[in-house]
Amino acid sequence: MADPALVRALSFYVPAAVVVATVLAVRPDRRQGGAALLAGLWNATALLAVNVVAVRAGWWRFDSVGGELAGVPVDALLGWALLWGALPALLPERVPTTAVVAALVWVDLVAMPAGAPILVLGDAWLAGEALAVAIALIPGLVLARLTVSRRALPVRAAMQVVLFTALIFVGLAYVAVFANGGEWPDLEAGVAFQVTVLLAAPALAAVRELARRGGGTPFPFDPPDRLVTTGPYAYVANPMQLSCTLLLVAWGGLLRTWGLVAMAVVSASFAAGIAGWHETLELERRHGRAWSEYRRRVPVWRPRWRPWGGGTDPAVLYVAPGCDPCEGLARWLGARDPVRLDIRAATDAPTPVVRLTYIGPDGDQTAGVAAFARAVEHLNLAWAWLAWVLLLPGLARFVQLVIDAMGGGPLATPIGGCPRNGSPPPEAEVAGSLDGALRSDAM
């Protein structure tokens, strides 16, 4: 029988040595190294979940003592994540994905039975292997290759959100259970869900803004091409770090666990210290005076009450003339002096309009409930926070469906977008009255 200590050591050091040798041979650039890190983190998180499920389902169990996370040997988990995550991400793209997956699955099919005595396989262990391939190996490799090639930005951004959300909540769960003597503490699920949604909204809105306006992601090795100063970034320079810190503090209070508060302090200190210093240097190098001006106007941790209006052209909200609720909304917005938002009649829109339509300074367009949310972002922090909640994935569409079902659907005839030759469009007279009403209301 093999020595358990030797098996555990080999389970980490062999994959680590292979990864180091690959790095020395390939000499990955910054983006490829970042992709390897992302894939390794994805596999570490997903494989932890797979092993917890596998033990509960009886697919396999671990006979080990010490150095465990949720009953899984940490050294074996890290070695597995290096082999399935970092290693394939470092390989050249010319190596076919199917060949990489097939080779790594074959290695695992050989290594799993050889894991005795620390790993004891059940009769249905191949079910756990299939689950691991489906949610760890393949998604991690896809994320890595998309990151290196800069393809499918929405997919990359969404997968990063899933990854870092999982990392945060794995940390939350582990610290909370450890502090409670190995059991999950009592918690009102409804309250926890509402607090999480409320505090996570700015971070998710920031990810969306970086992808749609900046052409990149929050990950330092996959950054935006353009400086983003809209959305949450018009209020605070670090919306994601702020959301993460507030979440940890809030969950620490809900679970009465000081360890989570300590995690928040450490996280904030790191973000404000070494990470903040490095980020500032990098952004100054890439964006120059635009970044310096932005940082003078927008705090890092303390949000502004009103958004900063510099750095971009005004956004435009197009309102259908003759629509009483739309005109009322336009007057309501105009009376509150929105920052860098022009309100115009839909007859002036560059594309046909059937709903309230918002067009950002870069041409990004939304309609209906989402357009309302983007418009109120220009008012103040309270309205902006409501907008970020409303813009959570699926929520704006659900609210739009409810409004449509209650009779607030799109216009039967589109307005604007196709100017006629000769005389102005028949809506122009009504549009003029809308513009006049907005001007008189502003006065």
What residue spans do the PLM features occupy?
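A conserved hydrophobic position in a structured secondary element of the catalytic/binding core
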Residues: 202-205, 237, 321, 367
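Glycine/small-residue-rich hydrophobic helix-like segments
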Residues: 239, 248, 364-367
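Soluble, non-transmembrane catalytic domains of enzymes that act on hydrophobic metabolites at membranes
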Residues: 310-384, 408-443
